[in-house]
Amino acid sequence: MSWLEKILPKSKITTPRRHNIPEGVWTKCSACEQVLYRAELERNLEVCPKCDHHMRISARARLESFLDEQGRTEVGAELEPQDILKFKDSKRYKDRLSAAQKATGEKDALVVMKGTLKGVPVVACSFEFSFIGGSMSSVVGARFVRAVEECIKEGRGLVCFSASGGARMQEALFSLMQMAKTSAALDRLTKAGLPYISVLTDPTMGGVSASLAMLGDINVGEPKALIGFAGPRVIEQTVREKLPEGFQRSEFLLEKGAIDLIIDRREMRNRLASLLAKMLNTHVIEE
């Protein structure tokens, strides 16, 4: 025992009581690393309130925040993916589908809803990137075509939020065929005189960017979204040159004329409602 311990009274050292904080209450911005309250981030549509970084948002959450609450219905929910080729790589395709369905709660990588946008009749589609990288499968193509058919039948505008790595390799040519299938459907929509607004979010790559994502009457990008066919590293290795800073980001594409607008996710609802109202010769209902 030290001389200090002899002259000082013994005191019981107490530590603050640990509070059990439920998992998932806090998260961190992937750009600025600011610690954020999860509920506040969700209210801000997964956009960091400090640096305005647009994080990825689930397809269903995006559509529910985008469309009017009243009267929206899901389209093509009964369509389910099939392992036609009995494909197997390091894992069976059937097992990959089951794991993705369990993780996301979705049957496939595209969710389609019919409803109104501030009173303007629309059909809206959104890719679920967490479902096998938002890859385009036969079901994704079929649901997109169903969305187009609903627009033509009822005179609605079409909006699609893309977030995809491209065609689904496990479905081979069945997946690649969806590029032509969705493009042909959009041609019918154009001939019907109905508008299509394509919103490219982070990331939109491969076969999706080479088909339905770039065929909008108006192509919109979210801020700093990665948009292209092949990834920047693949291009650098192919051309053996250093790419410009910000290459394949939405700001770069806007500067080069590849997209028409960049819209903050929090302004998307108002801006697209205004555009669609003009294109459909109707008016928005102010909230």
Swiss-Prot record:
It catalyses: N(6)-carboxybiotinyl-L-lysyl-[protein] + acetyl-CoA = N(6)-biotinyl-L-lysyl-[protein] + malonyl-CoA. GO terms for cellular component: acetate CoA-transferase complex. The keyword ATP-binding applies. Zn(2+) binds at residues 29, 32, 48, 51. It is found in: Cytoplasm. Coiled coil: none annotated. One of its GO terms (biological process) is malonyl-CoA biosynthetic process. Pfam families: Carboxyl_trans, Zn_ribbon_ACC. Its cofactor is Zn(2+). Keywords: ATP-binding, Cytoplasm, Fatty acid biosynthesis, Fatty acid metabolism, Lipid biosynthesis, Lipid metabolism, Metal-binding, Nucleotide-binding, Transferase, Zinc, Zinc-finger. Binds 1 zinc ion per subunit. Pathway: Lipid metabolism; malonyl-CoA biosynthesis; malonyl-CoA from acetyl-CoA: step 1/1. One of its GO terms (molecular function) is ATP binding. PROSITE patterns: COA_CT_NTER. It is an enzyme of class 2 (transferase). Its EC number is 2.1.3.15. A zinc finger (C4-type) spans 29-51. Residues 25-287 form the CoA carboxyltransferase N-terminal domain. Belongs to the AccD/PCCB family. Acetyl-CoA carboxylase is a heterohexamer composed of biotin carboxyl carrier protein (AccB), biotin carboxylase (AccC) and two subunits each of ACCase subunit alpha (AccA) and ACCase subunit beta (AccD). NCBIfam families: accD. Component of the acetyl coenzyme A carboxylase (ACC) complex. Biotin carboxylase (BC) catalyzes the carboxylation of biotin on its carrier protein (BCCP) and then the CO(2) group is transferred by the transcarboxylase to acetyl-CoA to form malonyl-CoA. This is Acetyl-coenzyme A carboxylase carboxyl transferase subunit beta. It comes from Aeromonas salmonicida (strain A449). The lineage of its organism: Bacteria, Pseudomonadati, Pseudomonadota, Gammaproteobacteria, Aeromonadales.
